[in-house]
Amino acid sequence: MDWIQTAGAGTQLPENNIKIAVFGIGGAGNNIIDDMLRMHPELQTANVQFFALNTDLQHLKTKRYVQNKAVIQFEESKGLGVGGDPQKGAVLAHHFLEQFHKLSDSFDFCILVAGFGKGTGTGATPVFSKFLSNKGVLNLSIVSYPAMCEGLKAREKAAKGLERLNQATDSFMLFRNDRCTDGIYQLANVAIVKTIKNIIELINLPLQQNIDFEDIRSFFKKPAQRLENEANLFRVTNTFTFSFDAHNTIEHFSHKLKNFEYEGFFDHKVEGAQKVILKVLVNQGLYPLDLTQIQEIIWAKIDNHNLEVQLGVDFTDANPSVQLFFLMEKKQAVSSDFIQKPAFISVKEVNQKPAKPFQVLNDLKELGLKYVKQQTGFNY
């Protein structure tokens, strides 16, 4: 056991060594993990490790920043991929379990990141998640769901994969590629990277009013015993962040949270959530915060009198901020109320009428060009 000396007290305390592993599974998962280490190399430490796993050796070799790489293969597969077949991905994952055990054995919390709709991520992620759950290792899956333009077949594969994943994982976050426009999926990667970074920091950076690892375990962990009517519910999580300054006031916070479903990449409404982790970083000299007012805004949005709240508070020299993690139980893996418009479109512009497939494709292209023009100033 590691010990730290307490100054002037002559006593020793055991050092907190929570170990976290982040596994990027399949092509999309590999891309996200590589992007994460490109943007935040400081996150990889002795206690936080990143892994890229893939059946496609050729793609795996293109990842420059992640150092821990492994090919999910078995004899005749030869690292050539699975041709978009989730069943083949699952079979190879089962053959890979002995190696996965060695990779994951020393970790307390595992985050699995994958794109659903093709072969490796869709097939292998539920296998690895179930293996971790059977060992009692806390695990969270962050997965993406295909956009309409990726085809109905991909969506069918993803939906079946989510059903298998829900039976295996403690909880999952679902990102919808529908929220991206004209195939600008790099925006999704950035959002997922930010989410993983926030989770790692929530665990590793102590607060004055702290949220300890057992608080986090109780938040994400699937109950050992569930009622019969709860057995098939999907345990999904969402996350929301907001930074305060002279131009981003408590009124703006309230507006953004009220319009959460229109301004985020993750699926599912948060009304009726059972649990919330609320992390507040305070700088009263820069922007005074009223915690009671913040909590009232959150409760009004969620509208659940039985809401469980884990509150963490600390001081910062930077802009004050709020981070929220929501946990809900839903009847569907993917919310039925499809929202076409991305975050840069105002709520008033959202068209609630169902669109024809070709209309959606044209809308996606138009909105993608509008976004690029807005971000770069370049006129097409």
UniProtKB/Swiss-Prot annotation:
One of its GO terms (biological process) is FtsZ-dependent cytokinesis. Keywords: Cell cycle, Cell division, Cytoplasm, GTP-binding, Nucleotide-binding, Septation. It comes from the Bacteria. Transmembrane segments: none annotated. One of its GO terms (molecular function) is GTP binding. Coiled coil: none annotated. InterPro entries: Cell_div_FtsZ (IPR000158), Cell_div_FtsZ_CS (IPR020805), FtsZ/CetZ (IPR045061), Tubulin/FtsZ_GTPase_sf (IPR036525), Tubulin_FtsZ_GTPase (IPR003008). GTP binds at residues 27-31, 119-121, 150, 189. It is found in: Cytoplasm. The keyword Cell wall biogenesis/degradation does not apply. Its main location: cytoplasm. One of its GO terms (cellular component) is cell division site. Essential cell division protein that forms a contractile ring structure (Z ring) at the future cell division site. The regulation of the ring assembly controls the timing and the location of cell division. One of the functions of the FtsZ ring is to recruit other cell division proteins to the septum to produce a new cell wall between the dividing cells. Binds GTP and shows GTPase activity. Homodimer. Polymerizes to form a dynamic ring structure in a strictly GTP-dependent manner. Interacts directly with several other division proteins. Belongs to the FtsZ family. NCBIfam families: ftsZ (TIGR00065). This is Cell division protein FtsZ. It comes from Mycoplasma pneumoniae (strain ATCC 29342 / M129 / Subtype 1). The lineage of its organism: Bacteria, Bacillati, Mycoplasmatota, Mycoplasmoidales, Mycoplasmoidaceae.
